[in-house]
């Protein structure tokens, strides 16, 4: 090998060794509905975008893929989770679905089954899973409302995964933090959503 080739090889090797350790990104896949899709606000104001910026500072080895769709249900999420897992090979999957199932009064047995399947598929892909809990207004009746809320904690216990008790904690009952529909948070509320998620997500970033 010529001396020039050897020098080039050494330079290339040094360049590779000087690359930051976080150059290879680990993906956090967010599979959610309008609450994660920044409905009614700018995309860069949503809690998922805020999460990306926080990761860049605190966990630069991770990046976010936001696969959230406004209006999506657990059935819709189940229908696209396989493709999302194959496409993005996530290290962590954040499942934020179920709110639209509840608001539409869909059968809770089906919702539980769909969420269970999404979690199972994600775990089978060797991803760590964070389940994001939701609640619905009491006008759906005490039985439906109570059973809806317990699905998230019960599934988290069953699969031994992390769970955010309620994404809209501190937001849902404050009209000043909600859009005109009384459901979707304003941009000013998005940092609170991230703070509700972060303590449960951070331990998964290893």
Language-model regions: role of each:
Residues 40, 65-73, 102-106, 182:
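Acidic/histidine-rich helix-loop elements
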Residues 1-9:
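Bacterial N-terminal signal peptides that target proteins for export
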Residues 8-9, 22-28, 60-61, 188-191, ...:
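Catalytic-site microenvironment of enzymes
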Residues 11-12, 75-78:
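Short gly/ser/thr-rich secondary-structure transition/capping motifs
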Residues 18-20:
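N-terminal signal peptide c-region/cleavage motif recognized by signal peptidases
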Residues 50, 78-206:
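Alpha-helical cap/lid subdomain in secreted, periplasmic
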Residues 22-70, 80-89:
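Serine-esterase "nucleophile elbow" of acetyl-processing enzymes
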């Amino acid at each position: 090998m010529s001396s020039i080739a050897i020098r080039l090889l050494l330079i290339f090797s040094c360049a590779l060794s000087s690359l930051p350790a976080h150059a290879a990104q680990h993906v956090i896949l967010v599979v959610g509905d309008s609450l994660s899709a920044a409905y009614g606000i700018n995309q860069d104001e949503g809690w998922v975008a805020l999460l990306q910026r926080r990761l860049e500072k605190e966990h630069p080895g991770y990046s976010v893929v936001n696969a959230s769709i406004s209006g999506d249900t657990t059935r819709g999420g189940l229908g696209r989770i396989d493709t999302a897992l194959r496409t993005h090979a996530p290290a962590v999957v954040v499942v934020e679905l179920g709110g639209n199932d509840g608001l539409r009064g869909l059968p809770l047995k089906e919702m539980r089954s769909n969420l269970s399947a999404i979690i199972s598929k994600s775990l089978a892909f060797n991803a760590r899973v964070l389940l994001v809990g939701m609640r619905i207004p009491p006008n759906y009746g005490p039985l439906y409302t109570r059973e809806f809320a317990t699905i998230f904690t019960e599934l988290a216990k069953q699969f031994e995964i992390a769970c955010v008790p309620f994404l809209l904690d501190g937001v849902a009952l404050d009209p000043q933090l909600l859009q005109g529909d009384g459901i979707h948070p304003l941009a000013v509320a998005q940092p609170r959503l991230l703070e509700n998620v972060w303590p449960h997500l951070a331990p998964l970033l290893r």
